[in-house]
Amino acid sequence: MENKNQKRFVLIHGVCHGAWTWDKVKTQLEVAGHCVTAVDLAASGINMTKVEEIQTLNDYCKPLLEFLSSLGSDDGKVIVVAHSMGGISAALAADSFACKIAAIVFLTAFMPDTINPPAYVYEKLLRSIPQEEWLDTTCVNYGKPDFPLQYTLLGPKFMAKKMYQNSPVQDLEVVKTLVRENPLVTNNLAGTRSFSEEGYGSVTRIYIVCREDLVEVEDYQRWMISNFPPKEVMEIKCADHMPMFSKPQEVCALLLEIANKYCKN
């Protein structure tokens, strides 16, 4: 029998990670009776694209855009949940498929506005972090010399100290074997044209603040919220940059609350 209360979630991972990031949350949402798709962006997870093949933000987000394009009117609207750099991917998707999205949930994610270039919020944070704080994270230029792009690989020490400090140690050990080189969403990758008011700007947004994030620190998350106010702000205490590992039950509970409130399929 069809579950009339079933919601459809689309989960977007952050830089260097993959769909596997969401395994704990995905399982809990499915047990609650919902349909969940966690997407591997290009050159992420099991997606076979090479990072050097990614020349634009559209290239990087191609798997997400193709999935949303495949949804028909019978599928109902989806709740897009974006983590970290995935917030910029979610905004791009909303610009093309606003009519298919009930809401975007930014889980300690970069939340672009509709005035500045897509990479504005990321590059603002980047300027505020001293180079030495990236520890063993590497960053490499690729592409054309006169139009350089960049990819990164998060270092084990950086992940342990800045990203997973409240998460189970055994989870981090697995993560170290799964992260891949990913493009950084710079102005050269994303372009300088802002996301549109009629597309991305028309979609309901909810921001979940992670109080103990040491990458996108709470003050910075609050700045993004004031820069482009969402419909609602929630928070998770004691959550690090990876709340799907440090606080999966709390993440799931908030997503279910959001789905019931904002998705009326």
Swiss-Prot record:
Keyword set includes Hydrolase: yes
Keywords recorded for this protein, A-Z: Hydrolase
A UniProt-annotated Pfam family: Abhydrolase_6
Family annotation (InterPro entries): AB_hydrolase_1, AB_hydrolase_fold, MES/HNL
Superkingdom field: Eukaryota
The protein's enzyme class: hydrolase
GO molecular function, one term: hydrolase activity
Known EC number: 3.1.1.-
Active site per database record: S84, D213, H241
Protein family according to the UniProt entry: Belongs to the AB hydrolase superfamily. Methylesterase family.
Its job: Putative methylesterase.
Record PANTHER family: METHYLESTERASE 19-RELATED (PTHR10992:SF1020), METHYLESTERASE FAMILY MEMBER (PTHR10992)
Protein name, UniProt field: Putative methylesterase 6
Organism: Arabidopsis thaliana
Gene that produces this protein: MES6
